Amino acid sequence: MLPGAWLLWTSLLLLARPAQPCPMGCDCFVQEVFCSDEELATVPLDIPPYTKNIIFVETSFTTLETRAFGSNPNLTKVVFLNTQLCQFRPDAFGGLPRLEDLEVTGSSFLNLSTNIFSNLTSLGKLTLNFNMLEALPEGLFQHLAALESLHLQGNQLQALPRRLFQPLTHLKTLNLAQNLLAQLPEELFHPLTSLQTLKLSNNALSGLPQGVFGKLGSLQELFLDSNNISELPPQVFSQLFCLERLWLQRNAITHLPLSIFASLGNLTFLSLQWNMLRVLPAGLFAHTPCLVGLSLTHNQLETVAEGTFAHLSNLRSLMLSYNAITHLPAGIFRDLEELVKLYLGSNNLTALHPALFQNLSKLELLSLSKNQLTTLPEGIFDTNYNLFNLALHGNPWQCDCHLAYLFNWLQQYTDRLLNIQTYCAGPAYLKGQVVPALNEKQLVCPVTRDHLGFQVTWPDESKAGGSWDLAVQERAARSQCTYSNPEGTVVLACDQAQCRWLNVQLSPQQGSLGLQYNASQEWDLRSSCGSLRLTVSIEARAAGP
């Protein structure tokens, strides 16, 4: 912060302080009191009468006495953060008719009396996070008809009374995450007809009653992640017509009923990662056309059927990493014209169809890392005009002529540093080389007899000065044995019938500008098939008239 701005802020803060005394251990501002003295043992009696918000942080008092704030009826917000509160006297919050926001977080109380909040008829937000609550009485919220936000995260709740939320017809947010809930009464949430966000993450739920969400027609967000759910009733989401975001990750779901998402026409985000899914039923996403983000990572999918994503024309992010996918149909992504990010890493893909990404003109990021790909078909990225982030590492790339298309594409459209850990697995003389750092001339293949433009003579059958034509007209299939010298500058590819391809990289000899006319040179070449001696002779002759 600039010195002048700091001085201005400090001056305004000092002006905000009241003229009259502030309670010991507290700081007072215009309408707010902040108390953080560890020696503060009780709620101060001399809180300024104009105070609307009071916040206690890491104070030492353990008991909140009866009508502790009785002298401050204008309070609208009371907060206790990481205090040692463990007991509330009867009517502890009495005399606060205007209180709208009450928070007690990080304390150690185990239970609450039924009438503890009975006078807080204006309360709109109640936060009781990360305490030691083990149970809640059924009538705890009976006087809180105005409540819109209720947070009970991080307690020790194992069960909830079925009529606990009966009076909360205006509640919009309910957070029950990080408790020990193992089951839910089917009618527990039925009174919450205005609820928009429900968080049940990190509990011990193993299943859900069929109608548990049956009355939540206004729900927009549902968090069910990090439980032990293994199976979902087919109609469990059937009344959630307004649902936009659904978290189901980190459960034990093994299969999904075909109709499970049939009513979720407004769903924009769905997370199914870290489950045990092996198959996705055809038509599973037929009724979720608004999906923008879909995550299926860390499952056990071996294939994805054609048409699985046929109706997801608005999808922008699709995550299929960390599965066991071995094959993808050519048209699996055909309808995903809005797709921007596609994650296919950490699968068992060995080959990709040339048209696999054909309609993905808006694709910007594609991960193919950690598969079993050896090459990519020519033209596979020709219609991906916005693709500049391509992850390829962790594949056994064969750096021959079949990789030339990918190599040239990388040189033209991506930063070489993005794939600096993408290595050649073969041929032997290029093993371990960084793919983007290669020279295109190194990406060569042996040619067939019909397209060979030179003859090979073995050392014992040739004479020095034999003629060679190094013009190779076309690259073709691999041979069975590839011989090379230790430096990798001379490579000879042979099959059982004959040697079909030769690549020689000549370096000038000391004191010479290069291999001279009418000269020859020998190399000892080795491979897993054996060894041989190669002689190359060059004889220059005058051209005819």
Curated annotation (Swiss-Prot):
Whether or not any Cys residues participate in intrachain bonds is unknown, but they do not form interchain disulfide bonds with the 50 kDa catalytic subunit. Glycans are attached at residues 74, 111, 119, 228, 266, 348, 359, 518. This is Carboxypeptidase N subunit 2. Residues 1-21 form the signal peptide. PANTHER family: IG(IMMUNOGLOBULIN) AND LRR(LEUCINE RICH REPEAT) DOMAINS, TIR DOMAIN-CONTAINING PROTEIN. Residues 22-49 form the LRRNT domain. It is found in: Secreted. Residues 395-447 form the LRRCT domain. Its main location: secreted. One of its GO terms (cellular component) is extracellular region. The keyword Cytoplasm does not apply. LRR repeats lie at residues 98-119, 122-143, 146-167, 170-191, 194-215, 218-239, 242-263, 266-287, 290-311, 314-335, 338-359, 362-383. It holds the Pfam family LRR_8.
